A protein has these predicted regions:
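Short, hydrophobic beta-strand segments that form beta-sheet elements in well-ordered domains
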Residues: 1, 149-151
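Conserved P-loop NTPase-based nucleic-acid remodeling module centered on helicase motor cores
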Residues: 2-79
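Short amphipathic alpha-helical segments and helix-helix/interface helices
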Residues: 8, 164-165
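A short helix->loop->beta-strand "cap" motif at the edges of active sites that frequently abuts
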Residues: 15, 169-173
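Short, flexible loop motifs at catalytic/binding sites
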Residues: 155
Length: 174
């Protein structure tokens, strides 16, 4: 064991919750990899709907990292709607007023894609990154924390701030 490996292992032992908000939600919800949408799920959804869906998450070592899609403008609009207006059933309509859509049929296509994705996840009991936060907020089970450190807070979405607020309210860190 090298000093670097030992240090990382010791850090994980000493600070088990030193992680991203997504990883914290993943851990606290006790999620398993098979419950998360993966490449095969997105490929199946594409085949079923004839529309382009891409995996926005990169999995590794139990940590999920959000990646930009860039391959699916319509899916990016859906993701933006959930990030900006997580608890608003009118989220897509609000985002439609804020972003320039590429063509006249885009609204209908995006609304159908959102419905298809929602139904697919429901039918297969799968989650995406945005679902971690929704479930974590519903469950309200943050770990007991002495300190709460938010790195790059300026980049957090409204949804992520809701998670931070819930953690602060329940855990009451210094």
């Amino acid at each position: 064991v090298t000093n670097e490996e030992w240090s990382e292992a010791e850090l994980k032992k000493m600070f088990p919750y030193f992680c991203t908000l997504h990883s914290l939600a993943y851990k606290r919800l006790r999620l398993e990899a098979h419950e998360i949408m993966d490449e095969l799920d997105y490929m199946e959804l594409c085949d079923m709907t004839g529309r382009k869906f891409v995996n926005k998450m990169k999995k590794g070592n139990g940590i999920d990292i959000s990646m930009p899609t860039a391959q699916s403008h319509y899916q990016d609009v859906i993701n933006l709607a959930y990030a900006k207006y997580p608890n608003d059933d009118d989220r897509l309509q609000k985002v439609f007023r804020e972003v320039k859509l590429p063509d006249y049929g885009a609204r209908n296509t995006i609304m159908q894609m959102d419905k298809d994705l929602t139904n697919f996840k429901r039918d297969r009991h799968k989650l995406e990154y945005v679902d971690y936060f929704n479930s974590f907020l519903e469950m309200k089970n943050p770990p007991p924390l002495k300190y709460l450190f938010i790195d790059e807070a300026q980049d957090l979405s409204a949804h992520q701030w809701m998670v931070v607020d819930m953690i602060q309210y329940i855990s009451k860190p210094i």
